[in-house]
């Protein structure tokens, strides 16, 4: 998943055109749209809330399985909202669609970098470290995006203050969307306040992650490695650094050839090429999503059955597709 700041800035870039199309004018609608741009990522943070049953941790499932049906279910879930909730729900759904567009577009580049690093034959580094490598790549891109867009670093731009704003009323509306999305897509029943718990955990973890000088990151990273018996720290890989740089070695700014690890397609697009292309798809995608004809067939046309990783999937599959082998 491109990280929190990249998705937030993508949403801010897309907001004017989406607001114009949907007539979004209130602060709640604005906040709901930007939350939507985080997609199902907040559900990963349910692990930080022991009050929530583990059966609600469906973030990974949503990222990898039945993407077209998920979007069609989200569209249908809007009909279950009260009239007073509908505009907030539509704003969130439009943001969720933007999250999908960016995720499925940028992820092949992220995974190409990840597999290149993990498969490079470096002693003490292999695919068992993929989660930390993936997070490190996305953290670096996040820092680049922040400095490029806001000319700030996390020393002054604190993610836990600047991002994830929404009232409890907005979160309650989004809870209902997740309940119906998961029920209709995966036959899974979530707790009615699942998303609210996830978002509040996400906010708390972002505060914990804030370590611009990396002192807290080094301390907590050492604890994580020691008690988790891990070679590398996921906390250290995810904690933003005070890095005033609008470049990243993972952005392919030199337009070198790289291969999509999921399709074998070879291209030379940079991160910003892909970011801009995804942004260019937003108007037509929003128009299609909110048309009266939108259903699973139209969702398959929109997604091409690519999941949030940009990986082809079986539209009826119940398991995440396997990762590419080293020979592919």
Predicted regions and their residues:
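N-terminal leader/auxiliary helical segments
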Residues: 1-95, 100-328
């Amino acid at each position: 998943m491109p990280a929190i700041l990249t998705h937030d800035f993508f949403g801010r870039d897309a907001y004017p055109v989406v607001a114009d199309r949907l007539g979004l004018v209130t602060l709640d609608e604005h906040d709901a749209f930007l939350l939507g741009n985080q997609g199902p990522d907040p559900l990963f943070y349910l692990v930080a809330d022991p009050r929530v049953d583990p059966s609600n941790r469906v973030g990974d499932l949503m990222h990898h399985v039945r993407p077209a049906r998920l979007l069609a279910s989200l569209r249908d879930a809007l009909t279950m909202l009260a009239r007073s909730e509908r505009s907030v729900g539509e704003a969130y759904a439009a943001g969720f669609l933007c999250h999908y567009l960016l995720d499925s577009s940028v992820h092949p580049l992220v995974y190409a970098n990840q597999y290149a690093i993990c498969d490079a034959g470096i002693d003490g580094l292999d695919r068992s470290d993929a989660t930390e490598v993936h997070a490190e790549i996305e953290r670096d891109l996040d820092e680049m995006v922040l400095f490029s867009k806001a000319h700030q670093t996390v020393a002054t731009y604190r993610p836990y203050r600047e991002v994830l704003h929404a009232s409890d009323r907005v979160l309650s509306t989004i809870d209902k969307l997740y309940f119906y999305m998961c029920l209709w897509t995966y036959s899974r029943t979530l707790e009615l306040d699942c998303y609210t718990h996830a978002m509040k955990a996400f906010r708390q973890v972002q505060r914990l992650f804030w370590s611009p000088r990396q002192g807290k990151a080094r301390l907590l990273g050492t604890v994580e490695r020691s008690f988790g018996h891990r070679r590398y720290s996921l906390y250290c890989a995810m904690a933003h650094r005070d890095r005033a740089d609008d470049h990243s070695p993972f952005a392919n700014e030199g337009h070198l050839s790289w291969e999509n690890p999921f399709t074998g397609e070879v291209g030379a697009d940079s991160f910003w090429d892909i970011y801009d292309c995804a942004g260019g798809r937003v108007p037509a995608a929003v128009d299609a999503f909110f048309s009266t004809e939108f259903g699973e067939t139209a969702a398959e046309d929109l997604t091409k059955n690519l999941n949030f990783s940009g990986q082809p999937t079986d539209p009826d599959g119940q398991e995440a597709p396997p990762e590419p082998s080293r020979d592919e």
